[in-house]
């Protein structure tokens, strides 16, 4: 039982956290820079957009390095995981014979499959670790084993796993369109809680390919957690805690949640209330997969929401909706619930004090 728990923690906590590091450093920042470059135009804008595309295409490598770094792997395993991740990311292209042109040039269309990159990198790292430092030919053996094992599994398993997760994501997207109230609650609450837990909601949103109102509900849930904790814990943590949680991460509250689970209730109830409201009727908040699990962290969720919604709505209206549903209402609703629970004695001063 302990062995199973260790493997699950390895994959879903450390592994996905490492995957998120890679995603932030390539796909997510590349998407933001691409938008800025396109808005700038001209020579400098063109260069910036080109830099962004390079970053996006290296998503698989970033994931491989991020996972290996999180596992504290040796140098050769860490660097070789980049190649394994790239093979896994573009496994479908490799199988289809479209990865190389007739002249032998590498053709990288899009960022590839993030989950395929994770699977290939994880297997390559796990097997590469077994031989790292064990032979006098470590310089050759470890990179070769890491790349070959990860790449092979990436080709064999990656496309199938990615297809299943895409199917599951499409099911969530479709279900949210059909039943926005029920699914709005479910998606908003689950993604918000995942964001606060030591699991990467950003990686989950991208793996599932959330989009449209499903991604909109997911973003609301994440915003409620971050802004909710930032506001409700202000008395305990002041301005520093406000920014650390509001544009950093609500994961900082995990030690306190473990001791006092009731402090998690205000932002979670806010997610359940605002998630469906924000995606129905005239509000129709949407987002893309990249921003769906980011909340207000680095304002990535807001940038992606703007990019997604401005195509069909006026910029001023989109910004107004973002301010109201991503900041004002999550903070206000969480605070109202928090005050009620505090007055009833369920939450007390000092229970949300951060130790950092």
Predicted regions located by residue number:
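Pore-lining transmembrane helices
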Residues: 1-356
């Amino acid at each position: 039982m302990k062995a199973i728990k260790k493997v699950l923690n390895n994959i879903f906590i450390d592994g996905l956290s490492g995957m998120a590091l890679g995603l932030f450093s390539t796909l997510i920042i590349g998407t933001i820079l691409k938008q800025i470059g396109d808005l700038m135009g001209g020579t400098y804008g063109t260069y910036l957009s080109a830099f962004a595309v390079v970053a996006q295409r290296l998503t698989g490598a970033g994931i491989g390095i991020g996972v290996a770094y999180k596992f504290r792997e040796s140098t050769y395993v860490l660097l070789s995981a980049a190649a394994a991740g790239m093979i896994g990311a573009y496994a479908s292209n490799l199988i289809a014979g479209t990865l190389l042109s007739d002249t032998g040039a590498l053709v990288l269309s899009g960022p590839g499959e993030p989950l395929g990159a994770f699977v290939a990198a994880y297997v390559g790292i796990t097997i590469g670790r077994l031989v790292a430092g064990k032979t006098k030919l470590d310089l050759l053996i470890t990179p070769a084993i890491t790349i070959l094992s990860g790449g092979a599994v990436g080709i064999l398993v990656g496309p199938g796993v990615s297809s299943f997760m895409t199917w599951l994501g499409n099911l969530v997207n479709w279900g949210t369109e059909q039943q926005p109230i029920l699914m709005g609650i479910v998606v908003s609450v689950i993604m918000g809680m995942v964001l606060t837990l030591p699991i990467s909601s950003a990686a989950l949103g991208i793996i599932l390919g959330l989009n449209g109102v499903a991604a909109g509900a997911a973003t609301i849930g994440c915003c409620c957690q971050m802004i909710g904790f930032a506001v409700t814990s202000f008395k305990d943590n002041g301005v520093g805690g406000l920014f650390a949680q509001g544009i950093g991460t609500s994961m900082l509250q995990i030690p306190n949640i473990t001791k006092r689970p009731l402090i998690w209730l205000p932002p979670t109830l806010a997610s359940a209330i605002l998630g469906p409201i924000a995606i129905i009727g005239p509000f129709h908040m949407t987002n893309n997969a990249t921003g769906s699990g980011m909340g207000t962290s680095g304002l990535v969720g807001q940038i992606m929401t703007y990019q997604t919604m401005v195509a069909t709505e006026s910029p001023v209206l989109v910004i107004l909706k973002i301010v109201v549903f991503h900041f004002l209402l999550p903070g206000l609703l969480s605070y109202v619930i928090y005050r009620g629970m505090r007055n009833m004695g369920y939450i007390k001063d000092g229970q949300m004090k951060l130790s950092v």
